[in-house]
Amino acid sequence: MGSEAAQLLEAADFAARKHRQQRRKDPEGTPYINHPIGVARILTHEAGITDIVVLQAALLHDTVEDTDTTLDEVELHFGAQVRRLVEEVTDDKTLPKLERKRLQVEQAPHSSPGAKLVKLADKLYNLRDLNRCTPEGWSEHRVQEYFEWAAQVVKGLQGTNRQLEEALKHLFKQRGLTI
């Protein structure tokens, strides 16, 4: 498929097209694509990750869950390895929200190393965003509940990447939580 830079740009372009109508829940209505790009940036800049499969999966991690993208489509464009990682980090939206959250906690320790990296960076991005501003319609109590749930997920991802884990521990400590 060409150079790694070209592969990364293909994934970014694909994600941007798939998420083009979506916005984050922040007061500014930030374009959703900022999130997967931010997750990939955390992996490269803070965790030192250069694995192209992990970075592509980071860019694509919400496409199947939040758009009309299928896993077969991901595999067709980006290969079986990227598909497997995206599949690992994708929640089954046919399940109730509480069940999806429970499964994330339960499955975290059994995830592949690449999926663990994407999950850590995803949680770090989301928690930083929650510290920056409260999403539309969220109470401070709901924000704290999200932090508490995220701490349970992250606990199962320990031993994956020291830099990401330390950054997360710092955020949890600010909220009175330990992992």
Curated annotation (Swiss-Prot):
Active site residues according to the UniProt entry: 65 (nucleophile), 66 (nucleophile)
Catalytic activity as recorded in UniProt: guanosine 3',5'-bis(diphosphate) + H2O = GDP + diphosphate + H(+)
Enzyme Commission code: 3.1.7.2
Cofactor: Mn(2+)
Modification N6-acetyllysine occurs at: 25, 97, 123
Role this protein plays: ppGpp hydrolyzing enzyme involved in starvation response.
SMART domains recorded: HDc
One Pfam family hit: HD_4
Name of the featured protein: Guanosine-3',5'-bis(diphosphate) 3'-pyrophosphohydrolase MESH1
Binding sites annotated in the UniProt record for Mn(2+): 35, 61-62, 122
CDD domains per UniProt: HDc
Alphabetized SUPFAM superfamilies for the sequence: HD-domain/PDEase-like
Keywords for this protein: Acetylation, Hydrolase, Manganese, Metal-binding
PROSITE patterns according to UniProt: HD
Chain positions found as N-acetylglycine: 2
Molecular function per GO: guanosine-3',5'-bis(diphosphate) 3'-diphosphatase activity; metal ion binding
Domain HD: 32-127
UniProt similarity note: Belongs to the MESH1 family.
